[in-house]
Amino acid sequence: MLLSARGVARRFGSRVALEPTDVSLAGGEVVALVGPNGAGKSTLLAILAGSLEPSEGIVERPARVGWVPQRAAHYGRLTALENLRLFAALERVPPTRADELAADFELPADTRASSLSVGNRQRLDVALALLAAPQVLLLDEPTSSLDPAQRERVWHIARAVAESGGAVLVATHHWEELEGLADRTLELVDGRLT
């Protein structure tokens, strides 16, 4: 397993956002995580990514995890290219990788991220998640603001990560988008995997 979570749960005060949950991701697979708004999908992904501590349970993850949260993962006052170069430096990735991703995603080089369209900001966040060649890619509603061509591109990237031996977990409301892509589906309802 590339990623394993055992008994992870999360409470915010007295509110239970995520019941004790077990999740594992194997290399070579794309897994869809579906459920309604407020089901706990974003909470689970944040725990798996390591940006939110579980109230209980344990997560074993590889060193390189790429994560696209629902909320922006970039700095609005920097340009797309500056964001990519900053995160490349933090991840000890050659700056040429940042330049390649900016070109691959057709991101405007001189426009502040805060001035980009919602779709371009989403593409920037996907590019940031790919900087360090992640072994696990966690995507939280990554295509909600993308046009069909860009949406298809993100799904192609997800499949490429899996085909190279990585694992991908995609949270979405629209499981039909992932029918041809996902190897299996997990459903989360009221903080419980069903």
Regions found by a protein language model. Name each.
Residues 49:
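Helix-to-loop junction immediately C-terminal to a conserved catalytic motif
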Residues 166-171:
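Conserved H-loop
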Residues 34-36:
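The feature captures the beta-strand-to-loop junction immediately N-terminal to the Walker
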Residues 3, 18-20:
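Conserved structural motif at the start of ABC-family nucleotide-binding domains
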Residues 137-141:
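Catalytic Walker B motif of ABC-type/P-loop ATPase nucleotide-binding domains
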Residues 148-150:
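Helix N-cap at the start of a conserved alpha-helix in ABC-type nucleotide-binding domains
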